[in-house]
Amino acid sequence: MGTDAAGHVARSTIRPYSETPNVTRGGAPMRTFLRTADGVAIDSVYEPGGVVHDPGNVVYEQAEEGSRNGSGNAVPSVSQGLVLVVAHGFTGDADRPHVRRVAQVFARYGAVVTFSFRGHGRSGGRSTVGDREVLDLAAAVAWARELGHTRVVTVGFSMGGSVVLRHAALDTGDVEAVVSVSAPARWFYRGTAPMRRLHWLVTRPSGRLVGRYGLRTRIHHRQWDPVPLSPVEAVPRITPAPLLVVHGDQDAYFPLDHPRMLADAAGEHGELWVEPGMGHAENAAPEPLLRRIGDWAVARAG
């Protein structure tokens, strides 16, 4: 697994249609493809904060290569403060309603970057179910920094929750704080029926066909080699960045021993919120919880 900072492709900036409401805090929303360190195009959306637009109402615009920001045009004025980079769960993407809902809540606290992991949505490549996805997140974080943001908080759900942990461990100092929601602590867990179904989806040719045509997720056929650092192994390497672990007590995928292992590994740098009645990942995260996460991010990112 390479840990170099992700590179960038020629950026395709977006412009809102004329009827789109003005964005508060200055700047305009953008949508672009980023290039990861291993050459995968990642569909990414930037919202300056205050108002989140429907990403379907913006268009890609081919930009010139070679400038500092990947385009011949000046980057719009943006906040120099907090940005929340959202990493969705397996089978999600930047256009999914639950991801847009998360972005809408987080926009009250700062700018928001959402993106589609490889093999998901409009992004290229095929999903490696949390392995090389760390490079996708690295590209999104680098983009946020390039746009001028000095405080970055990554927020990941399920698969994305494991990715934000490994990214922070591999790129120490690249983020100010990390939030991991509904994440596994260890790999290859098959202790619940949903996880057994997921392993069938990922490891069997027939399962990958279901993933492609039923779930709009293109899954790589190769097994991990080598096996990446597990989430619980990654957590101690995140320090001194603060870590928030969030998990629902009704999560059907990963029981509560997973978040407790992560919190124990974090020691004094970690917090654990066990949410009564909550199920799994962004689909199950209620708005009050998302607001509490936003408050935590503002407080911990400095």
Task: Locate the predicted segments by residue.
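N-terminal cap/lid segment of alpha/beta-hydrolase-fold proteins
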Residues: G2-V51, Y60, G72-P76
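The serine-hydrolase catalytic nucleophile loop
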Residues: F90-A103
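Conserved alpha/beta-hydrolase
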Residues: A103-G124
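Alpha/beta-hydrolase active-site loop
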Residues: T128-L147
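Hydrolase active-site cap/lid region
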Residues: G173-W224
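Short beta-strand/loop motif that positions the catalytic acidic residue
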Residues: I238-T239, V245-H247
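Conserved alpha/beta-hydrolase "acid-adjacent" motif
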Residues: A252-H258
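Catalytic histidine-centered segment of alpha/beta-hydrolase-like enzymes
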Residues: M278-L290
